[in-house]
Amino acid sequence: MNYENILQFKGTWRVYQARVLDRVEHYVRDGKIHIVAAPGSGKTTLGIELIRRLQGTALVLVPTITIREQWIARIKEAFLCDGVNAEAYLSQSLKNPRAITVTTYQALHSAMTQIQDGEEDYQGFSLFQVLQDAKVDTLCLDECHHLRSEWWKSLESLKEKLIDVTTIALTATPPYDSTPAMWNRYIAMCGEIDEEITTPELVKEGSLCPHQDYVYFNYPTKQEEAEVMRYMQAHPDCEELDPEIEKHLANSLGKIESIRQITQHEYASLHGRLHMLILTDYIRKEHEKSIGNREADVNLLGVLPLFENLRRDAQDMWSDMRLGVLCGSIIVIPAGVKDALLKTVGDAGMVTFSKLGSLPETEYVKVSAVGDSHFLIPAVTQLFADGYIQVLIGTKSLLGEGWDSPCINSLILASTVGSFMLSNQMRGRAIRTWDREPDKTSNIWHLVCLKPWYESSFGTKPETSEDYRMLTRRMEHFLGLHYTD
């Protein structure tokens, strides 16, 4: 496929992007190009240019529908030549492939197994025949390690059937900390890593903002410490804590106090310029009824308990800090920004507002969509960027939908995730540059519960706690200055 007068990059290549592109002929000798590019490096843009240079008829596979749409949008905005009909060369449907067809791994699996998915019915559909007829000779895999087991099988089956196909593999988060078997499976699919674009060089080039990681330590609460001491007295010969207790301490209520203090500090420093994101593991929907009830106990790590803790703090300090909740099953905004939300939504959909807990509807409200709600997350994200919300609370699953907001300048990781892949995804949301604030810097806060009783009781150091080891795993593959070396 000759892309002359069809696709041409309209921008200027960064130094690190040009370095990769200058070596394409060397990388492609084994039929596979495998690029590791930190979040914010223009990974999608590189992928499109590689397809253009290889002059391939390409099938691009991505993790989610959101990312699929981002690929198509990027091609149109940054590559498509003036006067070219996009529909003639771009497709999001396996049933109607074009020069570049972008689809999800889920759709691939549905087509390979000939079942009906949410968008299309693949019963009786011969994907391999369609791809052969379309002369697909380039397979571009975006973050292919984000796959369920059955998706892996479908991808491997497709790859076996496609002959003389060049593979382009793009990722920000290689599964470095996976099992040897998983790593070997990944490398067999993508090939050995050809080039890595690192975070420090992206900061140097101005593609990512300067940022600092902080570790905020806390001790367990008195109640948690008493629970541990009871366990130790009942098991005097035990050399380590029960895994359930370790898990309990990883979700220590002391971390709630840490989050409160960090939030107060950041808001005192930035006020209306604060764009803080707090990511946790659970929503804790059962605590919705506690919101607005001062007598209710909300000491639990989760989206809604954290929201209520911070709401009470803001109320007690007469602070005008505005909070928001952004999750798939619940969205909360300040009541005073309802009109701004409606204006942002426009004709994209219909919105309703309802009471949150026992709060008066003049403070905070829940937001729901009438019918399809796909437009709500982008709309609330826009409110966040526009400063109507200073602190946004959500779960890590939000990232799986390809969510992003370059305005974030403070991130609290209130999650027990220790894997490099997910940690890098979360951390990457805070270090992007933002056009509205060219001098943006960002803080990333990691929470760790220590055990002050450990050294005297078990003869080991406090940092041997599972929570501390999780932090070590999380940090292991991040590049930065070492404290001593």
Locations of regions flagged by a protein language model:
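SF2 helicase catalytic motif II
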Residues: 105-108, 113-169
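Conserved helix-turn-beta segment of the N-terminal RecA-like "Helicase ATP-binding" lobe
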Residues: 66-93, 187-190
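Walker A/P-loop
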Residues: 29-50
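Conserved RecA-like P-loop NTPase helicase motor core
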Residues: 109, 314-318, 324-483
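Conserved pre-motif I regulatory segment
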Residues: 1-36
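Conserved Walker A/P-loop ATP-binding site and its immediately adjacent core
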Residues: 44-49, 53-77, 106, 151, ...
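Conserved C-terminal RecA-like helicase domain
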Residues: 38-41, 45, 69, 84-101, ...
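Post-DEXD/H (motif II) to motif III coupling segment of the RecA-like Helicase ATP-binding lobe
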Residues: 146-211
